[in-house]
A protein has these predicted regions:
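Tandem repeat scaffolds
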Residues: 26-247
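N-terminal amphipathic/basic-hydrophobic helices that include classical n-h-c signal peptides
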Residues: 1-24
Length: 247
């Protein structure tokens, strides 16, 4: 690299500046690796007419529309190339379920159990959920766009290439979770718990509101904006036991 030149590697979002091979300081700023967004392309679907969900059920290429699955047990079920639209999932049991290459639009429910489930290449659009249980779950290439999710339990979950976009998350619990290449874009994050979480290439700069209730010390693997740093300053000072006073 020649004197005063700069190079950008778009795959890793890194900016490198330096003076080349003739000495002097080389300054490297690694911003953040971008999340790979889910891009689901569904085949032609067949309407679901099977009645209730069943444990370990196998659902492939189906459309579930305006159905009430409240209280039903679909533990261990597999959903592949499916669309769930405007379905009720109140206390629906989907523990260990696998949701693959699917689109969930306008789903709603309280206490939906997706503990230790796998969501891969999934779009979750305009969901209205409360107390959804995804502890120990694996989320890979998942897009959460729009909607509101209260008290989301992601304790000890693994998130990789996940994007939260234009949604509201109230008191999400990421305790002990691993977040890698996760982005928050125009997303409201209220009262987040990051206790014992591991963050790698987590981009919080696009969050419309950023409120971390616990686990501020786990933000070392995240990127925030200058404005967000100022907003977090009082909480950071309190966390460090730092007193701030005028002269």
């Amino acid at each position: 690299m020649g004197s005063g030149t700069s190079a950008v590697n778009p795959q890793v979002g890194a900016i490198v500046r330096g003076r080349g091979h003739h000495g002097g300081m080389v300054h490297r700023t690694r911003v953040v690796k971008a999340a790979r967004r889910a891009e689901v392309r569904l085949p032609e679907l067949v309407g679901f007419t099977g009645g209730e969900l069943t444990p370990d059920g196998d659902y492939d290429g189906l459309e579930f529309r305006d159905l009430d699955f409240a209280g039903q047990d679909g533990a261990g079920a597999r959903f592949m190339d499916c669309a769930l639209t405007s379905c009720a999932l109140d206390e629906t049991g989907l523990r260990h379920a696998r949701v693959l290459d699917s689109v969930l639009t306008g789903i709603r429910g309280v206490g939906t159990d997706l503990a230790e489930a796998t969501l891969r290449d999934v779009e979750l659009v305009d969901a209205r959920l409360g107390g959804a249980q995804l502890h120990g779950a694996v989320l890979e290439r998942v897009l959460v766009r729009g909607g509101k999710i209260d008290y989301l339990n992601l304790r000890n979950a693994r998130l990789k290439d996940v994007v939260f976009e234009s949604c509201v998350l109230v008191e999400p619990d990421f305790g002990g979770a691993r977040l890698e290449r996760v982005a928050f874009a125009d997303c409201v994050l209220k009262g987040a718990d990051l206790t014992a979480a591991t963050l790698v290439d987590v981009d919080l700069r696009g969050a419309a509101e950023l409120d971390v209730a616990r686990g501020l010390d786990r933000l070392s693997g995240a990127v925030i904006s200058h404005a967000q740093l100022l907003d977090l300053a009082p909480v950071l000072a309190a966390e460090m036991g730092l007193r701030v006073a005028e002269v």
